[in-house]
């Protein structure tokens, strides 16, 4: 007799802002307008949510600053973010969980479902480092907000500090691959090239003439145009 398949135990959380012009991806302005930056943010969020939908999970939660929009697919519970600095908001999200939870942001649209499949028998925590020194994923088998609260955020040492916090608590840490956050025009071009089939890449291709010259530092003409052409060719 075949044993029944185990149900996924992980709650997958996405912490995000409503993609409103002037509130998201402001480091893309310039070269983008606020509206273009928000469109890139919405596409990144849509790709992220799609990856979460395709990953094994007991529950999927959007921890949202703002209001849901047409970019939110069915299958997610929506939990409002609390106020305060980022470490407090992350801590509050984990505090609301009763079992294993993996939290990611909206800045890595290249994430794939397989990266979000966690083997909790082999790990007490999951850590995904970001190229800028932060982290793109944090998972806890036993959610403990104290493991996040007080971690200095948005610094080049944030990721190292957070990982050291996990290790100092005696946790077995499973490391995920490093991913690049989308914060700048150069980030947008690089990430779009890594995941050319997604909505983020399509939006970046539409804005290639804006993004690529700045990303390469070549100006609007000359060699910078090569990058714009490369983005269009991946369509």
Go through the PLM ranges and name each one.
Residues 15-20, 65-66, 131-133:
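Short glycine-enriched loops at secondary-structure junctions
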Residues 72-102, 155-158:
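Short phosphate-binding loop-to-helix
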Residues 164-218, 222-235:
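Conserved alpha/beta core of the MobA/IspD/sugar-nucleotide pyrophosphorylase nucleotidyltransferase superfamily
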